[in-house]
Amino acid sequence: MKNSTEPFLDPVFLCKLIVGIGEVAQITGIPIRQIRYWEDKGIIKSLTEEEGKNRRYDYVNIKKMLMIKLFLDEGFTLDTAAVKVQERITFFEETFQKLQEASATNTD
């Protein structure tokens, strides 16, 4: 029997997760106005390409918003919070790349 929480831990599922700006605001507690401001500053990016269309966000950007909110709640400025979040993302991407390379080397 499959665990009912599996979809929430499944990277394929999370990559397909797309949420509108109103739902993101409800889920995260971040006001819509603030989300728009962060996007206007280039800190986050919606999947919406056309002007005037509802903004929609993927899991990565929602997670980014939550991390930014955490740093802001800890007293950091928005710019510093954005830098800290990007540093963490870069660290995880580099670590994941190294693990993939090590795995490929070990299977040869």
Where are these regions (language model features)?
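Arg/Lys-rich, alpha-helical DNA-contact motif
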Residues: M1-Q26, K45, E51, Y59-D108
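Short coil turns linking two alpha-helices in DNA-binding domains
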Residues: P31-Q34
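Conserved active-site tyrosine of GNAT-family acetyltransferases
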Residues: W38, Y57
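Glycine-centered, phosphate/nucleic-acid-interacting loop/turn motifs that mediate DNA/RNA or nucleotide
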Residues: G42
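Conserved catalytic core of two-component sensor histidine kinases, primarily the HATPase_c ATP-binding
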Residues: N54
